[in-house]
Amino acid sequence: MEKTWKINLSGFADEINPQLDEQIRVLKKLGMHYVEMRGANGKGLVEYPLDEVEKIKEQLDENDIHLSSVGSPIGKIPITQDFEEHFKLFCHTVNIAHVMEVPYIRMFSFFMPEGEDPEKYHDEVFRRVGRMADYAAKHNVILLHENEKEIYGDVADRCRKLMEEFYSDHFKAVFDFANFVQ
């Protein structure tokens, strides 16, 4: 008996158009039912209050479109910037994931100061990522660390260090091939 595989494609619809109606129209035309949402109507998803996130979810549900992941800016701040406000945004992002009924949140490991050795910031990166990973586990979401140019995890060795420390049911990796060649 031949085995049949079903593959669900997902993408960033805000690259189609910033307006949610147009994103939905094109996704439906392409037969896609999943999107990794970064933004809708010209605004980042994590910038919306939860009541507006619920309206976005209703609009997606009406069109049989679901999130594969919250495409967040979490961890895309300088490592030298205060973390507390960003952690509040992270907690809000976890709430958004619950409203959107998706366990996955794409995140990053903080921009490094230009010209400085990223290992100088190892302890602070790990403190911050560890705090988020602990929160993710307590709130049953899965963080997906993406390699990204100019962040701590912008090379394979440091991505490996992050995975060795944090890999769990609530912390995984997303690999963007282009980010290692930029």
Give a label for each model feature:
Residues 24, 46-49, 81, 116-119, ...:
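Gly/Pro-rich active-site loop or hairpin
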